[in-house]
């Protein structure tokens, strides 16, 4: 599903050039659950932004579903992104002025799906995430765990092939964090590829493979036997 070749990201100011990622080579298969770990500032979130086509690499190649996308225009990348990738963030990133239903519906509006089909798809995912009873509430009326359930619902409502999760349990207590990890595991069991940045050794144990970054480099990869292509 994903392959990177010597992926590099530089940030340049007038005086300083900083290397955020340097010669990162990855091969991530469909239906895999991969955790990316490393100290703060080592390039974890930068890598996730590149994989999600929210930013461009400074050098190297990025293949997504057998297409070399790093040279695509922003419009081309946006079209691929909205059809294939869902995002889950530590801070939820819900829109305060929209209800739970409207937040989850948003990706479907961008895809031009009819109102009747949107209603069915949103209700299906809210039922699956056990948050249907909150459909008309606003984010500020929800607990942290409920907000993250809504965020996950929004990420998966369009049935993307890939979920990118950046510290999905970082703002949650242990019980709600465990629920979110179980939801991600269920999605992965259903065939969704998941790449998750985490600082939590516990959360990383849900993955098939753990990739360790340090100073912008992949330093180790630990595989688990439970994933089979």
Go through the PLM ranges and name each one.
Residues 214:
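A cytosolic small-molecule/anion-sensing beta-strand core signal
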Residues 209, 217-229:
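Conserved beta-strand-loop-alpha-helix hinge in the C-terminal portion
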Residues 2-210:
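ABC family nucleotide-binding domain
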């Amino acid at each position: 599903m994903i392959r990177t070749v010597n992926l590099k990201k530089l940030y340049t100011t007038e005086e300083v050039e900083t290397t955020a990622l340097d010669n990162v080579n990855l091969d991530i298969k469909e239906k895999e659950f991969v955790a990316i770990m490393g100290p703060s500032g080592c390039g974890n979130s930068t890598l996730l932004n590149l994989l999600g086509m929210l930013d461009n690499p400074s050098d190297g190649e990025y293949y997504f579903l057998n297409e070399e996308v790093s040279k695509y225009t922003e419009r081309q990348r946006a079209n691929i992104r909205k059809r294939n990738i869902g995002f889950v963030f530590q801070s939820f990133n819900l829109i305060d002025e929209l209800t739970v239903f409207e937040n989850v519906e948003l990706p479907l509006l961008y895809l031009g799906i009819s109102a009747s089909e949107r209603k069915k798809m949103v209700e299906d995912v809210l039922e699956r995430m056990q948050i249907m009873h909150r459909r008309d509430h606003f984010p500020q009326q929800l607990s942290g765990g409920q907000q993250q359930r809504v965020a996950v619902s929004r990420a998966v409502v369009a049935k993307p092939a890939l979920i990118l999760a950046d510290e999905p349990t970082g703002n949650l207590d242990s019980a709600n964090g465990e629920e979110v990890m179980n939801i991600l595991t269920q999605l992965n069991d259903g065939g969704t590829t998941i790449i998750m940045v985490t600082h939590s050794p516990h959360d990383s144990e849900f993955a098939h493979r753990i990739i360790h970054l340090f100073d912008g480099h992949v330093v180790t990869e630990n595989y688990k036997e439970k994933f089979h292509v």
